[in-house]
Swiss-Prot record:
Induction comment from the UniProt entry of this chain: Oscillates diurnally. Rhythmic levels are critical for the generation of circadian rhythms in central as well as peripheral clocks. Targeted degradation of PER and CRY proteins enables the reactivation of CLOCK-BMAL1, thus initiating a new circadian transcriptional cycle with an intrinsic period of 24 hours.
Name assigned to this protein: Period circadian protein homolog 2
Region called CSNK1E binding domain, residue ranges: 512-717
Residue ranges of the region described as Important for protein stability: 480-484
Subunit structure: Homodimer. Component of the circadian core oscillator, which includes the CRY proteins, CLOCK or NPAS2, BMAL1 or BMAL2, CSNK1D and/or CSNK1E, TIMELESS, and the PER proteins. Interacts with CLOCK-BMAL1 (off DNA). Interacts with BMAL2. Interacts directly with PER1 and PER3, and through a C-terminal domain, with CRY1 and CRY2. Interacts (via PAS 2 domain) with TIMELESS. Interacts with NFIL3. Different large complexes have been identified with different repressive functions. The core of PER complexes is composed of at least PER1, PER2, PER3, CRY1, CRY2, CSNK1D and/or CSNK1E.
Stretches the record annotates as CRY binding domain: 1155-1255
PTM-bearing positions, type Phosphoserine: S527, S530, S533, S540, S662, S696, S700, S714, S766, S771, S945, S977, S1124
Bias (Basic and acidic residues): 504-516, 529-541
Tissues in which the UniProt entry reports expression: Widely expressed. Found in heart, brain, placenta, lung, liver, skeleatal muscle, kidney and pancreas. High levels in skeletal muscle and pancreas. Low levels in lung. Isoform 2 is expressed in keratinocytes (at protein level).
Domain PAC residue range list: 395-438
Residue spans of biased composition, Basic residues class: 790-803
SMART domains: PAS
Gene giving rise to this polypeptide: PER2
Post-translational changes noted in the entry: Acetylated. Deacetylated by SIRT1, resulting in decreased protein stability. Deacetylated by SIRT6, preventing its degradation by the proteasome, resulting in increased protein stability. Phosphorylated by CSNK1E and CSNK1D. Phosphorylation results in PER2 protein degradation. May be dephosphorylated by PP1.
Length: 1255
């Protein structure tokens, strides 16, 4: 570097000064002497042909130097050069003295020496044919000088513009103090020295004595010199980037003797090469150092003013294969590279193993460093990386070139990070372990061979092939690849506990890939949609959060314009990019995190929440935090039996979690509840929390044209295979669950699309009816804007559920409908849109096995009646249903009798219903005849389907009061419900069809509700224990728009569906076995899951919809009864079951299930439980002993006293309706000690026997 001082650049024109000739003759003669001396000297040293060898490289370099320094007229032939050089050397000037000649000779020798030293610094890639030419050397020297000067100027500009850091915080030392405070850190390591570099001038103010032994030079060599002069030229930029004043930590942070650790160095350290003088081989040898910078102030001895300095602790890095060697098992490092095969990051551990500093490899081609024979392997490796989809895998060893030119053999493991939005590989992660080291253990030795100036054509071609390969989106069968270095366990697979089907994911994957191949647009526009998908996600989320009503208002106009197209949304949806598991999971994690910010920190392990208890919405949490009412601090009472069962995931017929739930996070347990049961699917469906929140799913979902239900009935007969818990099994299970998760989300999406179209259809019909606009609670028939409604592009019609345009039963085509006058004598607040319908055929009572009496009057066709202005309506009386919020349909007998005609038979399971009042008193409708029910049917069904529940008959109140019936019989109150029936997925027909939204207050002051009752907040003073045994005093009525006579072609089905929904919400257990309706589970079983309690609303999670009624706490219900002090805070809406009555009859028939024998189902379940229990893991004796040593409480069995609490902190009212089961009752035997087994005997029989007894 000292040679750089001989060629300082001029401030005015630095590029011309070294090459411009001087006007005087003496400097010109010096230049000629330099060129001649350079030529002759180099020829004598390096060329075997002697001075007369004109074709040597040394003569060529001499000629280049002569052409640089001589003026144009002095450029002559090589022979002339030789004559001039001989004349200048052997014929000195007669006018001068010998002293002048000797000074010229000394100057000439010094120039030759400097030029040779400059040639040593020339990198190998700048050399021509392995030789350093004079021109290339001078150019490189000039560029290096400019770089150093530019760095200094930038440094000064940075210091002047930003100002100095606060002087009060920066410690100040003198040179002597600096030596004392640094000695305690460097005295322990002989390869470590300390140096203080001024941040103002760049000069060395202090350097420790260890440099003399490290560099074998005197300490004075560093005095009054700039530190960058000792660095390798290509490391100067790295040094300046890491020593910016505002990036440096204060020395006081690590000034303590014990606080300075290796971890502290690794966080802030960087690598540079340092050299002082050339070695005995007559070339400069740089040594790599790890440098850790700190910010201090140093006061110079002469000046009183202290200046900011960078204190560097530099430690020399030795080869990992030389003593002290790195152990073979620790010779591991990682790299990342981009899809175009450029190094993106290199682990620091690679420095002693490869000899390269991180800056040497970053942004350089990977293939250049590999052995030529191993380069083709990289194409196969990247193909497997694309197929694995983020899963790490091992591959055959490769040979990697170290800095000294030798190859080391590496065992490699590869993985990748996949962008969840574009589904493309962002970067590839390689984990390498050295198998065979180099023969030359000094990996920092100089490379003896010349480096390639340009990439070999084969490298370039191979790189292009790999880059084109990785432009493809990753197949969806792969996992996320989120984990660092390919660790897929770092993210949470929330689906694993509810899955029981082994083929759902694979079927969905095959179908998805086949559809991608069929869709030409998607195949052609991969790169297009990959760039747009992220923007669509962000845009959709922003739009839905900021202005959802504005989006919804534009939907009717949009759909009106597309009436001529059969399925416009379906066509548009096919072109949208696919929605991946990562997208849904990422957005769900963000949403749950944001919700947890408002959640009160009350998650203590007093009682566990089962996975099927829906998580609180953010509005619930805000209310639970600020509301003084009973909602605050109340959550659903837990079902410990449910969470303690050890049923595995292979049990296809049980809606139970596959493992005991974690208590770390309430939201993580409740985000995916097994409540959505589809017909034909034998596994609990994971409910997606973001069905209503996250806009990414509906927008980017791959809309399949096939039916929504892909799983056949044959899956339940899948044999039980005894599999070990291996890495392959876990990976396959993870992929299967992700695919199943996406499939269920897709089905939910399709269902919501169908519902939104039904909603729009009913809105279009009800336009022009002012009474409907003011009738609250009627979402499906009113013109009220729905805040949850997505835009038109997010919905698609399902062809098999669309009514024909010429249908006389429905106006589903969306055309304009003329307004009809209201019905004569119709009470506007006592009719539900599902209770009145247009019917083209008379109705009859339901056939068996209906458990209660339905008085279904009949009436003639609309054309035969002339008295009323609108067609009359069929109606029926709903019996008393055991729900926590009793609701009874108001009925009106028809005005005219008519002959009976057959209707569609809707088969029902043997659900148990308490018998209800057949009809209302005739006093309400004195002018109309009453049609009695069938007593035979009533008595038969009451005796056949209610063996355990005594019959109760409620006295109706005026008008249509809700009868008070108990949801739990006395026989079931004294014991815990069976653990197999704790699931809230009680109805297989519950297809995520209930959508809740707020209904603004209308002019009538009466808030309308539906037959679907929410399991949440009933009144301000309702306690968890009261709603099981008492009914709310406020009768619930509904307003009916006058146009609903055209809304229901299947009034029998819609009314029954409404009734089923009431029963489904009342029963906490229902049909836990999700195989069929005929499983025969008790409809009104006592359940500690708290379905009848008045907790904060969980139905939004339960049904996968927005519980926006929680958002409007001002919505009250004025009843006019004696109990008018009760206010209804939750305004419920009609489920989509009623809307589905407008669908075609063939569609409705697809939801019928054959009944199954209860005993046969239970017998299968017991056998599966027994098989699964054999597969449960058992502790070995050594494991038991180890656990006893760590956890003393395991010696006695049970749980530690800190968490062994039998109470539930969420149960404030300790009445008989609240059943909180202690932990000891459901703890399975851990097999830890004899005491544990004894305790199990005391508490009862083992789990499987108790299950059999209780079922």
């Amino acid at each position: 570097m000292n040679g750089y001082a001989e060629f300082p650049p001029s401030p005015s024109n630095p590029t011309k000064e070294p090459v411009e000739p001087q006007p005087s003759q003496v400097p010109l003669q010096e230049d000629v002497d330099m060129s001649s001396g350079s030529s002759g000297h180099e020829t004598n040293e390096n060329c075997s042909t002697g001075r007369d060898s004109q074709g040597s490289d040394c003569d060529d370099s001499g000629k280049e130097l002569g052409m640089l320094v001589e003026p144009p007229d002095a450029r002559q032939s090589p022979d002339t050069f030789s004559l001039m050089m001989a004349k200048s050397e052997h014929n000195p000037s007669t006018s001068g003295c010998s002293s002048d000649q000797s000074s010229k000779v000394d100057t000439h020798k010094e120039l030759i020496k400097t030029l040779k030293e400059l040639k040593v610094h020339l990198p190998a890639d700048k050399k021509a044919k392995g030789k350093a030419s004079t021109l290339a050397t001078l150019k490189y020297a000039l560029r290096s000088v400019k770089q150093v000067k530019a760095n200094e100027e930038y440094y000064q500009l940075l210091m002047s513009s930003e100002g100095h850091p606060c002087g009060a915080d920066v410690p100040s030392y003198t040179v002597e103090e600096m030596e004392s405070v640094t000695s305690e850190h460097i005295v322990k390591n002989a390869d470590m020295f300390a140096v203080a570099v001024s941040l103002v001038s760049g000069k060395i103010l202090y350097i420790s004595d260890q440099v003399a032994s490290i560099f074998h030079c005197k300490r004075d060599a560093f005095s009054d010199a700039k530190f960058v002069e000792f660095l390798a030229p290509h490391d100067v930029g790295v040094f300046h980037s890491f020593t910016s004043p505002y990036k440096l930590p204060l020395w006081s942070m690590c000034s303590g003797a014990d606080s300075f650790t290796q971890e502290c160095m690794e966080e802030k350290s960087f690598f540079c090469r340092v050299s002082v003088r050339k070695s005995h081989e007559n070339e400069i040898r740089y040594h790599p150092f790890r440098m850790t910078p700190y910010l201090v102030k140093v006061r110079d001895q002469q000046g009183a003013e202290s200046q900011l300095c960078c204190l560097l602790l530099a430690e020399r890095v030795h080869s990992g294969y030389e003593a002290p060697r790195i152990p073979p098992e620790k010779r591991i490092f990682t790299t990342t590279h981009t899809p175009n095969c450029l190094f993106q990051d290199v682990d620091e551990r690679a420095v002693p193993l490869l000899g390269y500093l991180p800056q040497d490899l970053i942004e350089t081609p990977v293939l250049v460093q590999l052995h030529p024979s191993d380069r083709p392997l990289m194409l196969a490796i990247h193909k497997k990386i694309l197929q694995s989809g983020g899963q790490p895998f091992d591959y055959s060893p490769i040979r990697f070139r170290a800095r000294n030119g030798e190859y080391i053999t590496l065992d490699t493991s590869w993985s990748s990070f996949i962008n969840p939005w574009s589904r493309k590989i962002s970067f590839i992660i390689g984990r390498h372990k050295v198998r065979v080291g180099p023969l030359n253990e000094d990996v920092f030795a100089a490379h003896p061979c010349t480096e390639e100036k340009a990439l070999h054509p084969s490298i370039q071609e191979l790189t292009e092939q790999i880059h084109r390969l990785l432009l493809q989106p990753v197949p969806h069968s792969g996992s996320s690849g989120y984990g660092s270095l390919g660790s897929n366990g770092s993210h949470e697979h929330l689906m694993s506990q509810t899955s029981s089907s082994d083929s759902n994911g694979h079927e969905d994957s095959r179908r998805r890939r086949a559809e991608i191949c069929k869709n030409g647009n998607k195949t052609k526009n991969r790169s297009h949609y990959s760039h747009e998908s992220g923007e669509q996600k962000k845009k959709s989320v922003t739009e839905m959060q900021t202005n959802p009503p504005a989006e919804k208002k534009a939907v009717p106009a949009m759909e009106k314009d597309s009436l001529g197209v059969s399925f416009p949304e379906e066509l548009a949806c096919k072109n949208q990019p696919t929605c991946s598991y990562q997208q849904i999971s990422c957005l769900d994690s963000v949403i749950r995190y944001l919700e947890s910010c408002n959640e009160a920190a009350t998650l203590k392990r007093k009682c566990e929440f089962p996975a099927n208890v829906p998580a609180l919405r953010s509005s619930d949490k805000r209310k639970a935090t600020v509301s003084p009412g009973p909602h605050a601090g109340e959550a659903e009472p837990p079902s410990r039996v449910n969470s303690r069962t050890g049923v595995g995931t292979h049990l296809t017929s049980l809606a139970l979690p596959g493992k005991a739930e974690s208590v770390a996070s309430l939201t993580s347990q409740c985000s995916y509840s097994s409540t959505i049961v589809h017909v034909g699917d034998k596994k609990p469906q994971p409910e997606l929390e973001m069905v209503e929140d996250a806009a990414s799913g509906p927008e980017s979902l791959d809309c399949l044209a096939g039916p929504a239900l892909a799983c056949g009935l044959s899956q339940e007969k899948e044999p039980f295979k005894k599999l070990g818990l291996t890495k392959e099994v876990l990976a396959a299970h993870t992929q299967k669950e992700e695919q199943s998760f996406l499939q269920k989300f897709k089905e939910i999406r399709k269902l919501s699309i169908f519902q939104s179209h039904c909603h729009y259809y009913l809105q279009e019909r009800s336009k022009g009816q002012p009474s409907e606009r003011t009738a609250p609670g009627l979402r499906n028939t009113s013109g009220i804007d729905s805040p949850w409604k997505k835009t038109g592009k997010n919905r698609k019609l399902k062809s098999k559920r669309v009514k024909p345009r010429d249908s006389s039963e429905s106006t589903g085509s969306g055309g304009p409908v003329s307004a009809r006058p209201p019905l004569v004598g119709l009470n506007a607040t006592a009719w539900s849109p599902s209770d009145t319908s247009q019917s083209s055929c008379p109705a009859v009572p339901f056939p068996a096995p209906v458990p209660a009496a339905y008085s279904l009057p009949v009436f003639p066709a609309p054309g035969t009646v002339a008295a009323p202005p609108a067609p009359p309506h069929a109606s029926f009386t709903v019996p008393a249903v055991p729900v926590d919020l009793q609701h009874q349909f108001a009925v009106q007998p028809p005005p005219f009798p008519a002959p009976l005609a057959p209707v569609m038979a809707f088969m029902l399971p043997s659900y148990s219903f308490p018998s209800g009042t057949p009809n209302l008193p005739q006093a309400f409708f004195p002018s109309q005849p009453q049609f009695p029910s069938h007593p035979t049917l009533t008595s038969e069904m009451a005796s056949a389907s209610q063996p355990e529940f005594p019959s109760r008959t409620s006295i109706p109140r005026q008008p249509c009061a809700c009868p008070a019936t108990r949801a739990t019989p006395p026989s079931a109150m004294g014991r815990a419900s069976p653990p197999l029936f704790q699931s809230r997925s009680s109805s297989p027909l519950q297809l995520n069809l209930l959508q809740l939204e707020e209904a603004p207050e209308g002019g009538t002051g009466a808030m309308g509700t539906t037959g679907a009752t929410e399991t949440a907040a009933v009144g301000a003073d309702c306690k968890p224990g009261t709603s099981r045994d008492q009914q709310p005093k406020a009768p619930l009525t509904r307003d009916e728009p006058s146009d609903t006579q055209n809304s229901d072609a299947l009034s029998t089905s819609s009314g029954l569906l409404n009734l089923l929904l009431n029963e489904d919400l009342c029963s906490a257990s229902g049909s836990a076995a999700s195989e069929s309706l005929g499983s025969g589970s008790l409809g009104c079983d006592a359940s500690p899951s708290g379905a009848g309690s008045s907790d904060t609303s969980h139905t939004s999670k339960y049904f996968g919809s927005i519980d926006s009624s929680e958002n409007n706490h001002k919505a009250k219900m004025n009843t006019g009864m004696e109990e008018s002090e009760h206010f209804i805070k939750c305004v419920l809406q009609d489920p989509i079951w009623l809307l589905m009555a407008d669908a075609d009859s063939s569609v409705m028939m697809t939801y019928q299930l054959p009944s199954r024998n209860l005993e046969a189902v239970l017998k299968e379940d017991r056998e599966k439980l027994k098989l699964l229990q054999k597969l449960q893991p058992r502790f070995t004796e050594s494991q038991k002993q180890e656990l006893r040593e760590v956890h003393q409480w395991m010696q006695t069995g049970g749980l530690p006293a800190a968490i062994d609490v039998a109470e539930c902190v969420y149960c404030e009212n300790k009445e008989k309706g609240n059943i909180c089961i202690p932990y000891e009752e459901d703890i399975p035997s851990l097999g830890l000690s004899e005491v544990s087994d004894t305790k199990e005997d005391e508490n009862g029989s083992p789990l499987n026997h108790r299950i059999e007894e209780q079922t």
